[in-house]
Amino acid sequence: EEKNKEIVDSINYAKRIQDAMMTSEGYRKSVIPKSFTFFKPKDVVSGDFYWVYKDQQENIFFTVADCTGHGVPGAFMSMIGTSLLNEIIVEKGIKDTNKILDEMRKQIIKSLNQDTEDDQKDGMDISICKLNMKKKTLEFSGAHNPLVVVSENELSTFKGDSQAVGLETVDIKPFTKHSMKLKKDDMIYIYSDGYQDQFGGDNGKKYMTANFKKLLLKI
């Protein structure tokens, strides 16, 4: 019982560290006032994370990521992810969304010594956006994860590249950047696979992506 208490205490402390590294609600709302997050981890600590940053050129970067592993292993990867975003965007000043993901992948492979295809395939699926409200422009890059834009009640999906941020058996290719102009009242959504992968309802089936997109149209 004492051992179990130590483990629980350690996990709760890890949650405090993880929470401290994620973007606070106050900062997010100050940067993107009409925004929301829905974050309900299955475990105390999570492999999913989100991050927001506004630079001096009025560019707002926001990202949602889903790291390999659940619970504690996923949480460790999420902390690596938030640290790398700070290093790449804030310190190094890399601003193109595709180059940010290229650099993240390079750093993760290097930091986890993923030199060969036989090594552990740790990494993350991620969506990253760069929004400029004055110019009404949006750039997006994704590793597996998509971007959804709802404009005039029409939903458009921009797919991420079919590769993770990490080492995979497929040939590594540079990430793609999607650029678009936004209209007034457009809604932008990025998300992990958690919501649509939920089992439930009368038949205990997966919620699925199609139902999730219908839900987004109702918001």
Can you name each region flagged by the protein language model?
Residues H178-I190, Y195-I219:
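C-terminal catalytic subdomain
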Residues E2-I188:
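… and, occasionally, acidic/histidine-rich disordered N-termini of signaling adaptors
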